[in-house]
């Protein structure tokens, strides 16, 4: 790319942008650099790319964060579908549909209830896990204190 400017990896966070997608390593955004981030939306493409304290600070600044286990669930969906013999086209279509639906649901829930997208995502995940477990023998234990 002859027209591009090469940056040091630590300078990438200083770029003013609309959407910032940390997609490689955990804890890329942390308490030491979160104030340098100049964006409107963070889509967590990596696993745990933002520390909890940094995510709370972004929320205080009005910067929306789509949690990692919502934004990067495509790999899990792909693996499950490939295991069952789905075609590449079907896998890509399903990933797109599920990620859009889950993201929309989490953001709407967060907005309506006045909670963070992460809190809404955790509640959605717990609801789905409980429902899935109710179909199995684990349902016998679902009333135990502290059980998912």
Describe the function of each predicted region.
Residues 23, 35-148:
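Adenosine-phosphate binding glycine-rich loop
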Residues 1-32:
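A structured beta-alpha segment of the ubiquitous adenosine-cofactor-binding alpha/beta core
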């Amino acid at each position: 790319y002859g027209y591009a400017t090469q940056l040091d990896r630590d300078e990438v966070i200083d770029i003013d942008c609309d959407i910032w997608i940390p997609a490689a390593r955990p804890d890329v955004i942390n308490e030491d650099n979160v104030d340098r981030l100049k964006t409107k939306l963070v889509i967590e493409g990596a696993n745990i790319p933002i520390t909890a304290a940094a995510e709370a600070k972004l929320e205080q600044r009005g910067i929306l964060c789509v949690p990692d286990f919502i934004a990067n669930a495509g790999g899990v969906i792909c693996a499950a579908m490939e295991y069952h013999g789905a075609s590449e086209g079907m896998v890509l279509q399903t990933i797109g549909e599920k990620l859009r639906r889950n993201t929309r649901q989490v953001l709407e829930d967060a907005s309506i209830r006045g909670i963070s997208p992460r809190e809404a995502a955790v509640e959605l995940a717990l609801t789905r896990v409980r429902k899935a477990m109710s179909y199995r023998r684990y349902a016998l234990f679902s009333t135990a204190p502290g059980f998912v």
